[in-house]
């Protein structure tokens, strides 16, 4: 059973009851997932940007968008319009597919993994987790990468509070640490 079907058939009715909501449409749901990677070295190394775009496309199944500098910062040696990262916004079936792979396959492959930090909510029910290396995703092989790069994964929910967001992610299978 896919994560999307599990959400519709068992998680949504359970959350409706647990959160004491009156309408099925009030139940929090995952709106989108943003996968973002900042590349400081992209200003000087164009191969890093190309490799990063390919990795993001492999991991998410969707072409990455190049993010560019809004203004020049001399200290970082960047000029306005220079590529400084890449991002992918996932919605719909691709989002659920990515979340399922991230929660069930990628997170358990992190070294010394004891769960994700339950304090990484933003106050509005959205959750962000930073990944230190792309090798946790089974689609990426160690032989094909030029260097280890991390990424930020933000799960945007329709939850009104952090408690609702946490309840939703726990039901989806997100392994929160106990501390």
UniProtKB/Swiss-Prot annotation:
Source species, domain of life: Bacteria
Gene Ontology terms: biological process: translation
GO MF term (any one): tRNA binding
Pfam family, any one: Ribosomal_L5
Keyword Ribonucleoprotein: yes
Alphabetized HAMAP family for the sequence: Ribosomal_uL5_B
Protein name listed in UniProt: Large ribosomal subunit protein uL5
Organism the protein comes from: Prochlorococcus marinus (strain AS9601)
Gene name, Swiss-Prot/TrEMBL: rplE
